[in-house]
Amino acid sequence: MGLQARLLGLLALVIAGKCTYNPEPDQRWMLPPGWVSLGRVDPEEELSLTFALKQRNLERLSELVQAVSDPSSPQYGKYLTLEDVAELVQPSPLTLLTVQKWLSAAGARNCDSVTTQDFLTCWLSVRQAELLLPGAEFHRYVGGPTKTHVIRSPHPYQLPQALAPHVDFVGGLHRFPPSSPRQRPEPQQVGTVSLHLGVTPSVLRQRYNLTAKDVGSGTTNNSQACAQFLEQYFHNSDLTEFMRLFGGSFTHQASVAKVVGKQGRGRAGIEASLDVEYLMSAGANISTWVYSSPGRHEAQEPFLQWLLLLSNESSLPHVHTVSYGDDEDSLSSIYIQRVNTEFMKAAARGLTLLFASGDTGAGCWSVSGRHKFRPSFPASSPYVTTVGGTSFKNPFLITDEVVDYISGGGFSNVFPRPPYQEEAVAQFLKSSSHLPPSSYFNASGRAYPDVAALSDGYWVVSNMVPIPWVSGTSASTPVFGGILSLINEHRILNGRPPLGFLNPRLYQQHGTGLFDVTHGCHESCLNEEVEGQGFCSGPGWDPVTGWGTPNFPALLKTLLNP
C-alpha cells in the first residue's frame, strides 16, 4: 500500500476521532500554591500549542552520543551538526503528513516547525483547540512571584488513537512555570557585620585557584549561556555595577553578547541577576548569551520553548547552565522521556548542559502512607551534568567545603543507572555507613549530582542594590559552568573540540581535578525513621556533592587533552 493510500485511511480514522487515548495519563494536575484561576478563556481567543512528534533512530543517537563523549573512543569530540541530528531523528514522512493534515483540518494556522522537524508550534482559537483535544478546557491562571498569567487546562486531554504512533504529547496544557528557588534568611547569629564578607567572585577565584590570568582570551569563538524560566529580567546596569564592586581584579566583559527572547524593562529578578553575574565572573571575558522567557505567550511552556530553540539553531554556545527543576513524579513519563531525548540531541552536538540539583536535599513525599525521597528532573537525566551545593566549613574564612544541607541529590525513579557511573555509585552504596533505609530510594536509578560548587551566602546586585545571603544550587551551577567555559577556551586555543557531554569522562577520571567533599549530610523527610537526614557525603563520589568542587589548575590539566 502506497503512502498516499495509507495516509487517506489513517486520516479517516483521525478525523472520525471515535477512538481516543490520553498520551499523558500520569501527568498530575495540581494548582501550585499561590496560583488562582481567573476563569474560562474566551472561545475566540487564540493560543499557541506545541506538538511533539515521534522521532526515529533514538538507539542510534544514543550510540553516537556514547562514541563522541567517551575519550577512549576514536570518535571522541567528532560532534554531529544540527543537520546531522535532524537527518537522524526527524519523524517519518507518514508522521509529518498525518499530523499536518490533522491540524489543518482543525483550523490550525501559522504552524512553525524546527530544523529537526520533531516539534510543531501552531496557533488555534480556544474553541478549535478544545475540539482538537477532547477533554481539554482552557482557563487563565495568575500566580508566582511576578504575578504571571498562563493559560492551562485543569482536565486531561485526549488524542485520536490513530495518532498514537505519531505524537508524543502536546505542550502548553498542564505544566506551570517553576517556582522561584528558595533563599535562606540571613543568619541571626552573626555578631559583627564586618566579619561576614560573603561569597563574591574574588572569594570563588581564591577557593578554586583561579588567577587574574584565568579569563577568556577574546580571540576564540568560545561562548556560554544561561537560561531563565522564572519570568524574570536581568539588567545590564546591574551587571556593570556588580563588576564595578566585585570584578576589579580580573578582565571581564561589561555586557551580555546576546539575549534570546524578549528582554523587557521591568524590575530585575535576583535569580536572573545571580545567573548572569556569576557565569560571567567565573567564565570571565567569555561571550555570554541569556535565554529569557518574559514576554512569551500565556499558553507556552518556557522550558519547552528553550528546547525548541536548541533544535532550531545550528550555532550555539558550548556551555549552558540552567536552574530549572521539577519533581520527577509531577511530570508525565512521556514528557520526561522526550525531554531526555532532547538532552541526548544536545550531547550529540557537543553541548555541555549543566542543571542545578535543587534546593530540597533528598526531597520527601508520601506514597500510600509511606515516606520516600523525591528526586528532581532534569537533575536526574543521564545526559546532563548536575551540580550540587557546598558551604565553607568556617563561614567567615575561605576554608575546605562541607555539604550545604539543601543540596539536591539522590536516585532517579525513572532512569536506570547509566554505565558511566556504575562503578562509582556501586562503591558508594557498598561503603557508605549512613545509608537511609532502602525503601526510601531506588538504588538502581541514575544517581546525582555529578559535581558541586559553593551555594551558600552569595552577594548579588539586583536593581542596582547589592544583596547578601543569596543561596542555592542556582548559584553553584553558573560557577561550575563558567569554569568549564575557561577550560573550553584552552581546548579551543590548542585545537581541541569543546568538552561536550562531560559525564563519561568525569566518571572515568574518578574525581581527578576536584576537591573531594567528605563531611556533611543533606536534608530529607522530617519523620522518626530518618529524622530529616538524607544522604551523607564521603570519600569519592556521593549523591550530595558528586565528585566534588573544582580545583581549576588540576581540572584544566585533567580535561585539556585529548
Curated annotation (Swiss-Prot):
Transmembrane segments: none annotated. GO terms for molecular function: endopeptidase activity; lysophosphatidic acid binding; metal ion binding; peptidase activity; serine-type endopeptidase activity; serine-type peptidase activity; sulfatide binding; tripeptidyl-peptidase activity. Ca(2+) binds at residues 516-517, 538, 540, 542. Residues 1-19 form the signal peptide. It catalyses: Release of an N-terminal tripeptide from a polypeptide, but also has endopeptidase activity. CDD domains: Peptidases_S53 (cd04056), Pro-peptidase_S53 (cd11377). One of its GO terms (biological process) is nervous system development. One of its GO terms (cellular component) is lysosome. Residues 20-194 form a propeptide. Its main location: other. Binds 1 Ca(2+) ion per subunit. Residues 198-562 form the Peptidase S53 domain. SMART domains: Pro-kuma_activ. Lysosomal serine protease with tripeptidyl-peptidase I activity. May act as a non-specific lysosomal peptidase which generates tripeptides from the breakdown products produced by lysosomal proteinases. Requires substrates with an unsubstituted N-terminus. Monomer. Interacts with CLN5. Interacts with CLN3. This is Tripeptidyl-peptidase 1. It comes from Mus musculus (Mouse).
